[in-house]
């Protein structure tokens, strides 16, 4: 079942194929229409002590936690994924290779983003997860404390 061009439910196979082709064309053109799938901040020139990776609502808390960690003298880089499919492996892989510790900050219990990163990149990189799944957003202090404990 798929909707027709008018938005009405349709079981027509030709319509289904046409609608799927339309979705696939949109997916293939996403990288061209979305030029910055990974937003980054932090040292470009050398290896980072910590790479903090997040997406969605984690960005603000990660930015502030990174600032606090930099005040402690650590070289911290942030990567905020703005697009998950097609996965931006080419943009993320160099960041993973240049970091001593990679911490993925996620608002879920099962480390879904870390799992996706492992599947879509070389998989040999050790990722650690900072998870929170009580329905509330991360605070910068929570991320800061967990980073200090994990490194």
Give the residues covered by each predicted segment.
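Flexible, low-complexity linker and terminal segments
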Residues: 1-151
